[in-house]
């Protein structure tokens, strides 16, 4: 260690001496200077919120946290989430309100799965305290006694365009945190000595997460800019920035830096690579089983193959059959209750640094609530798996609120997200195993309606590989489906064969990536005629995907059958027919196209 370095970190049982405190103050000012220089070179600027938290960041990174700077992926490192809208290493938090949920996932993994010493810190801005997802995370952390988690509120009073509703009424933040069962401290966010003491005390608290409410000021240390409302998003003129930098530099008393203490190396060695199906499928042809039940059985089976497989649920486990996993692996089942945004964030946190294989389950329709969390998870390139049950009209006994008819459009729009849509129990089991082995975000769309097993146990499946489930040399048209509509297509094929009309039926299996080669080659073999039939609105679903895939191919025409209006409650077969996607409507479409 050089003369200009000193050891920081919570390895010390006593508080910092005055020299260490001064180094921390100086490092906070250096952070301000770097923030000024970085933001001044941009056409937009988030300078003022960067400056308000400088002391917090100085103490956190150079006194409190334990980590190896040269090994940022080390599983024993403490974790930090900057939920003020700033990205940090593994989790891009995007719009404020998402970071604490991801921090909860990391803390849960550390406490219950890794049973390790690392701690998790999350810096939040006061403006994001108006986001409901923050308080979903507060409730989760309190319920699960995440005493290895600390949330730090940077209460600088000013939001994007105006003052916050409670401004600097620190006691309001304190009461809110305490009401959720958190150990809470109120501090002056500029006082490094108090920050050091409080951060150290929090490490000794057991059974509760800790919240630190820090009163700060935007643009701290900048004359005529500090605590004003007119500077958010504005770049500072170079001359003014240079003058402020000189002023701050004059306050720096030492050139020393602090080196963080190394982590306690007690995280277990794990392996989440190459998970295989331990035993063959037990299903036989024509067994009747819903794909969502098959998915629950597959998850439980997968849990026996690797002890890092976890399942998160939003109080729907008795509907989506994740309760099967819960019964067989209760220590790896996380009940998130009806808080879908937080469930997705927790799953993202659990999956960071490849510590778990996470599956988050709820009604497919309810994932629309968490779309922002999903898109930000894709930006972070974190591998999680989402299972959406009760898709489409298969849940038509319920009301339209439960019917997911937009979910394919949502998940197809997420970069690099793999979208599975299995049609029977065997393909569902393969989808679960393929998702577990994927390094991308995956969505598995499952149905409530019982459908027949159509594949044998010897069938193999691959991501991006469709299946031609019915064909002959005399086929005049292709019908492409998935899920319940594939079975409607097979019924239609049987009926049409009685009239000597042969059609080819394709099961897409994955909607994204799409098996373009199979679609085009079979279309060319059947006169360039394609019908897509889907239990989804026409926008963004199977029809749109197929149309895009063949758009550059001459002499191929696609006819789309989809749910064209808001559905009504009823039996599944009635709802399919009412919406124009039943076997009867497929037969009519085939005849109409062939006549023309």
Regions found by a protein language model. Give the residues of each.
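Thiamine diphosphate
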Residues: 2-121, 253-445, 450-451, 460, ...
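Residue(s) in the substrate-gating loop at a strand-loop-helix junction
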Residues: 126
């Amino acid at each position: 260690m050089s003369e200009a370095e000193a050891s920081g970190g919570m390895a010390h049982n006593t508080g910092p001496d005055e020299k260490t405190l001064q180094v921390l103050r100086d490092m906070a000012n250096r952070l301000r200077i770097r923030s000024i220089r970085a933001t001044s070179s941009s056409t937009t600027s988030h300078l003022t919120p960067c400056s308000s938290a400088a002391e917090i960041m100085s103490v956190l990174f150079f006194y409190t946290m334990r980590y190896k700077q040269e090994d940022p992926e080390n599983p024993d490192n403490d974790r930090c989430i900057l939920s003020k809208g700033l990205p940090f290493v593994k989790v891009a938090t995007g719009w404020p309100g998402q970071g604490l949920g991801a921090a909860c996932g990391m803390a849960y993994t550390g406490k219950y799965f890794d049973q390790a010493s690392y701690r998790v810190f999350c810096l939040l801005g006061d403006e994001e305290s108006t986001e409901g997802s923050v308080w979903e995370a507060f409730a989760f952390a309190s319920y699960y006694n995440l005493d290895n988690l600390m949330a730090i509120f940077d209460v600088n009073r000013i939001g994007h365009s105006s003052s916050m509703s409670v401004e600097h009424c620190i006691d309001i933040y304190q009461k809110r945190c305490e009401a959720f069962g958190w150990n809470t401290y109120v501090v002056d966010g500029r006082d490094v000595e108090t920050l050091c003491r409080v951060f150290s005390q929090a490490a000794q608290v057991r059974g509760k997460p800790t919240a630190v409410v820090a009163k700060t000021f935007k643009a701290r240390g900048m004359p005529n800019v500090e605590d004003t409302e007119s500077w958010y998003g504005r770049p500072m003129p170079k001359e003014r920035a240079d003058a402020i930098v000189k002023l701050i530099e004059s306050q720096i008393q030492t050139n020393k830096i602090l080196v963080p203490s190394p982590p306690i190396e007690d995280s277990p060695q794990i392996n989440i690579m190459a998970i295989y199906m331990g035993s063959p499928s037990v299903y036989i042809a024509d067994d009747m089983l819903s794909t969502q039940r098959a998915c629950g059985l597959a998850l439980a089976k997968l849990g026996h193959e690797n002890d890092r497989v976890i399942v998160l649920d939003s109080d729907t486990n008795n509907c989506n059959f994740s309760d099967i996993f819960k019964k067989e692996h209760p220590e790896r089942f996380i009940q998130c209750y009806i808080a879908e945004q937080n469930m997705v964030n927790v799953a993202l946190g659990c999956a960071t640094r490849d510590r778990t294989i996470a599956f988050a389950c709820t009604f497919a329709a309810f994932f629309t609530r968490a779309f922002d969390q999903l898109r930000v998870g894709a930006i972070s390139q974190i591998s999680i798996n989402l299972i959406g049950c009760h898709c489409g009209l298969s849940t038509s006994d319920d009301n339209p609120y439960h019917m997911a008819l937009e979910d394919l459009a949502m998940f197809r729009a997420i970069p690099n997200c793999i979208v599975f849509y299995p049609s029977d129990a065997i393909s569902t089991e393969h989808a679960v195993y393929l998702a577990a082995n994927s390094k991308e975000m995956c969505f598995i769309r499952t149905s409530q309606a019982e459908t027949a097993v159509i594949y044998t146990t010897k069938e193999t499946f691959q991501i991006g590989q469709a299946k031609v489930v019915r064909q002959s040399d005399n086929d005049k048209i292709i019908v492409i489906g998935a899920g319940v509509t594939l079975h409607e297509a097979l019924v239609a094929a049987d009926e049409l064969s009685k009239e000597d009309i042969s059609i080819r039926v394709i099961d897409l299996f994955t909607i994204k990536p799409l098996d373009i080669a199979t679609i085009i080659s079979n279309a060319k073999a059947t006169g360039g005629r394609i019908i897509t039939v889907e239990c989804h609105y026409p926008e963004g679903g199977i029809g749109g995907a197929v149309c895009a895939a063949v758009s550059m191919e001459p002499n191929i025409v696609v006819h789309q059958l989809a749910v064209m209006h808001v559905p009504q409650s009823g039996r599944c077969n009635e709802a399919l027919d009412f919406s124009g996607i039943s076997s009867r409507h497929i037969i009519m479409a085939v005849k109409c196209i062939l006549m023309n």
